[in-house]
Swiss-Prot record:
Similarity comment: family membership: Belongs to the eIF-3 subunit J family.
Region (Disordered): 1-104
Name listed for the protein in its UniProt record: Eukaryotic translation initiation factor 3 subunit J-A
Main location: cytoplasm
Provenance organism: Danio rerio (Zebrafish)
Role: Component of the eukaryotic translation initiation factor 3 (eIF-3) complex, which is involved in protein synthesis of a specialized repertoire of mRNAs and, together with other initiation factors, stimulates binding of mRNA and methionyl-tRNAi to the 40S ribosome. The eIF-3 complex specifically targets and initiates translation of a subset of mRNAs involved in cell proliferation.
Segments of skewed composition (Acidic residues): 1-15, 28-52
GO biological process: formation of cytoplasmic translation initiation complex
InterPro entries: eIF3-like_dom_sf, eIF3j
Residues forming coiled coils: 34-96
Cellular location(s): Cytoplasm
Subunit structure: Component of the eukaryotic translation initiation factor 3 (eIF-3) complex, which is composed of 13 subunits: eif3a, eif3b, eif3c, eif3d, eif3e, eif3f, eif3g, eif3h, eif3i, eif3j, eif3k, eif3l and eif3m.
Length: 249
């Protein structure tokens, strides 16, 4: 048994361990993909950080832009108000001088207009929508009565400016533009209405001129009688110039 054991010991050669194929958890090239993905993730994080920084920088600039827009609107509104006030002052100078009461009323009216415009500007800047619409802006005519009320409000709105030198040109342009969409028959009606108004105005003007002329004209026969009286004064006796004048006549 000892020999067998020694033989076994001499002839025994330890088997080389079978090299197992290297176990790869990942396919070839996946490690590289992971590296690329890691790089992508890093890039995305950097981009997000940059976007956040841009947003934080953009917020104050947006606020600045909004404040600038508000200032621009305020300046524009003030310019319009100043131009309107100058125009009203010029028109007032051309017209009959105002009484102290009229001047005070005009100042109050201009002040009210300025306050209203400032209020509307503030509402627009803060996004406030006013539902308390009144007057002509609240009218949406559909029936005949609605248009009658609309007509009254329009006249009240426009009539205060009838003394302006620009009033007639304003009406001419306004009527022309408003009548562009009308049919021929409707235009004829408007034309006839204005023609009647023109004839009535011309008749009144002639009547007024006739009254002025009559004040300087003597009644019928007055000139002849006056000439006879003058000749009689110069004749001084019966059968003088007055008689000659009668014979001549």
């Amino acid at each position: 048994m000892a020999d067998a054991d020694s033989w076994d010991a001499d002839s025994f050669e330890p088997e080389e361990p079978i090299k197992k194929a290297a176990v790869h958890d990942k396919w070839e090239g996946e490690d590289e993909d992971d590296d690329v993905k890691d790089n992508w993730d890093d890039d995305e994080e950097e981009e997000k950080e940059e976007e956040e920084e841009k947003k934080t920088e953009a917020k104050p600039t947006e606020k600045k832009k909004l404040s600038e827009k508000i200032k621009e609107k305020e300046n524009l509104q003030r310019k319009k108000q100043e131009e309107l006030r100058k125009q009203q002052l010029e028109e007032t100078k051309r017209d009959t001088p105002l009484t102290p009461e009229d001047e005070l009323a005009e100042k109050l009216r201009v002040k009210q207009l300025q306050e209203d415009s400032d209020l509307e500007l503030a509402k627009e800047a803060f996004g406030v929508v006013s539902n308390n619409v009144t007057g002509i802006d609240a009218v949406s005519p559909s029936s005949k009565d609605d248009f009658t009320e609309f007509e009254r409000l329009l006249k009240e709105k426009i009539s205060p400016y009838e003394k302006s030198i620009h009033y007639s040109g304003f009406l001419e342009t306004l009527f022309r533009d408003l009548c562009l969409s009308l049919e021929v028959e409707d235009l004829k009606k408007i034309n006839n209405s204005l023609t009647v108004l023109l004839s009535e105005k011309q008749r009144q003007e002639k009547a007024n001129k006739g009254k002025k002329k009559k004040k300087g004209v003597l009644p019928g026969g007055g000139l002849k009688a006056k000439m006879k009286d003058d000749l009689a004064d110069y004749g001084g006796f019966d059968g003088g110039y007055a008689q000659d004048y009668e014979d001549f006549m």
